[in-house]
């Protein structure tokens, strides 16, 4: 286990180096018409949804390390296929999207379960601290990769994917130096595994934690969808690409800082307080994007607030995972996290379909703000009264761990 802890943080940094993040849409548009670019995105999201839960079950059944090795190998292949693509290479780009989706699906939940299993009996606050450091390094890596990715666009866009292939290969090599964490129980057959996860949901704290994260996936993604138009309103067509790249870099740096605050916030305000503060911040951000449509000065405010769009997720990640994984059996940790992610993606898809009913961006953002406020009220209701955020409940099944 010492080898795992020795190489884990360098691995998480390398795994976060996706240099193509700020330029991938432009990269696609340079090779394909917009309609086919949207088809590529649909292929990616469909593959992620299809692989999300099976990859979690695979991790619980076969092992954490093999699952992460598959993830990194898929990312290497994906990046090389992207780099090799040329104008009109839809099939090659679609294959690259499939491998990219597999890479992210096989990482989802398994990285957290790997660290939690490695720490074994010492998990808890130690896991929370290490997960916070891991998350912080991941955001720092994303910030650095975004800055270099923008430079790659000027020099040679394919370089961003070649650098990503190299970093993913390096992460793969570090995984080879690690060992599979010992577990006394393996995952059951798929249907039985699903029944066990649903049984875990009978714990009031578990379903509240899962529901909160799934709902926040929706709220976190709204700024990603509507930030680009706000940046365009502020900087114009000519500079929107550069502005978006700089904005991404600073947003990731702030998220890295917030990730390190997670354990402190939890110890100071309790888990309920930390999650509610995260919900409140995102609600204010979504409301500011709506107000930005009406007033130019609010566009500046919204863009400034959007620098912190990843901070709530970063701050809540370690406390939330520590609380949830401590209540889940070792044979279904990755499956539960995958189900949580799948639920969030499904809710976000339904939200997009709902917003599409209104063709005007102003109306869409008004509805999104309304949904954010409703979720905030539900969070206050189910995570604890606003005046008693730090209160520790008496019954484990009815109260969130503080």
List each model region and its residues.
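C-terminal transmembrane helical hairpin of 12-TM major facilitator-type secondary transporters
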Residues: 272-316
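Helix-loop boundary and gating motifs at the non-cytosolic
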Residues: 1-50, 205-250
């Amino acid at each position: 286990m010492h080898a795992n802890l020795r190489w884990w943080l360098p691995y998480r940094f390398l795994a976060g180096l996706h240099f193509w993040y700020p330029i991938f849409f432009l990269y696609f548009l340079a090779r394909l018409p917009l309609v086919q670019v949207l088809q590529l995105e649909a292929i990616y999201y469909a593959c992620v949804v299809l692989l999300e839960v099976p990859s979690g079950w695979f991790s619980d059944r076969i092992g954490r390390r093999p699952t992460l090795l598959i993830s990194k190998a898929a990312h290497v292949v994906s990046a090389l296929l992207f780099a090799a693509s040329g104008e009109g290479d839809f099939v090659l780009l679609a294959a690259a999207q499939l491998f990219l989706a597999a890479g992210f699906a096989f990482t989802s939940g398994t990285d957290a379960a790997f660290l939690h299993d490695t720490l074994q009996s010492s998990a808890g606050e130690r896991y929370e601290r290490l997960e916070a450091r891991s998350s912080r390094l991941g955001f720092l890596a994303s910030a650095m990769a975004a800055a270099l990715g923008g430079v790659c666009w000027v020099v040679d866009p394919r370089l961003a994917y070649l650098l990503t292939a190299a970093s993913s290969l390096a992460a793969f090599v570090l995984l080879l130096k690690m060992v599979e964490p010992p577990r006394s129980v393996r995952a059951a057959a798929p249907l039985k595994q699903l029944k066990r996860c649903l049984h875990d949901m009978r714990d009031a704290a578990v379903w509240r934690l899962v529901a909160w994260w799934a709902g926040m996936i929706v709220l976190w993604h709204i700024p990603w969808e509507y930030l680009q138009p706000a940046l365009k309103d502020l900087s114009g067509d000519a500079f929107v690409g550069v502005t978006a790249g700089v904005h991404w870099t600073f947003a990731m740096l702030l998220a890295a800082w917030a990730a390190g605050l997670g354990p402190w916030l939890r110890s100071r305000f309790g888990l309920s307080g930390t999650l509610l503060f995260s919900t409140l911040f995102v609600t204010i951000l979504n409301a500011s994007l709506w107000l930005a449509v009406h007033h130019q000065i609010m566009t500046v405010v919204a863009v400034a607030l959007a620098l912190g769009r990843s901070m709530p997720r970063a701050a809540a990640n370690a406390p939330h995972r520590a609380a949830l994984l401590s209540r889940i059996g070792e044979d279904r940790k990755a499956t539960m996290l995958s189900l949580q992610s799948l639920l969030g993606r499904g809710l976000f898809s339904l939200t997009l379909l709902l917003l599409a009913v209104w063709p005007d961006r102003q109306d869409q953002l008004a509805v999104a703000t309304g949904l954010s406020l409703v979720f905030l009220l539900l969070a206050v209701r189910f995570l604890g009264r606003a005046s008693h955020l730090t209160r520790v409940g008496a019954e484990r099944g009815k109260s969130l761990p503080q």
